[in-house]
Amino acid sequence: MSTPSPFGHDLQREEPPYTILKAPVTADPSAPRRYPWAWQKYLDACANHWMPQEISMERDIALWKSPHGLSEDERRIVKRNLGFFTTADSLAANNIVLGTYRQIRAPECRQYLIRQAFEEAIHTHSYQYIVESLGLDEGEVFNAYREIPSIRDKDAFLLPHIEVLAAPRFQTGTPETDAALLRSLIVFAAMMEGLFFYVGFAQILALWRQNKMVGAAEQYQYILRDESMHCNFGIDLANQIKIENPHLWNPDFQAEILQLMRTAVDLECAYATDTMPRGVLGLNANQMHKYVIYIANRRCAQLDLPEIHPGTPNPFPWMSEMLDLKKEKNFFETRVTEYRTGGGLNWD
């Protein structure tokens, strides 16, 4: 931007750097988009819109009510999953609304974060819909984060990384606070949404492969699709911040992230053992542990970090198709009702 000069030429005033953390906050939808990848992710997320009540739970209800429909081990998996996921997506939404959104200044990134928070609400709605459809004890399911150690420990791992950003006086702009934001982004993208959900996804989709709990599993497929996008967006956001602030990505910080990832792996392996103490659905806890490590290695690679256990193979190759967005089928072909934007509104 130029400033008039009495000497007959304009002085050049240097603009402040435009970065994820220093972009001018604007409500102008025509503002230049410096990060087209973020805007594209927003458009992709909007194209994947779904609502839980569009999916029939009729077969699931009949199976759950049948005394011989599911084994006790299978029922344990379903209830443990719902117990963790109902809390987890609420934590994810709180992290966005109370923390991350306030600190990320690029408008196209904020646009995606708003969409992501809405999707977290849809996921919570989905778990409630499943719980109500099956007639489960809501107190048992919704209090699992207090009463089940393997769930409580995962939540306890996440909470400090929400609280630091949600503190009223927290503000980026120093190396310490910028690092705190980057750390929180990585924990939620790569460890929560990118790791803590995947034992549950594999278990419920293993039921689906045996034609069990098909309505719940279809919702989990939609959620898997959403969470894969959340994970990838969060990691892309973290990587962009690393590029713009290379001093943050120093050896000590990288070592800290690797240690957090190892802790997250231990917590998810403990959860896998708790949810399936015996082999079920052709799965066992040892396979799940290898799967957790395989997923953790993928997240490390996305962050340009060394794998925690190099070369660990994927014990569930049938999950690969669902983890790769480019190969996912169009789940929306199986909806019980055609989605119409605003179709349920009456303006009279």
Task: Go through each PLM region and give its residues.
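Non-heme di-metal
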Residues: 2-348
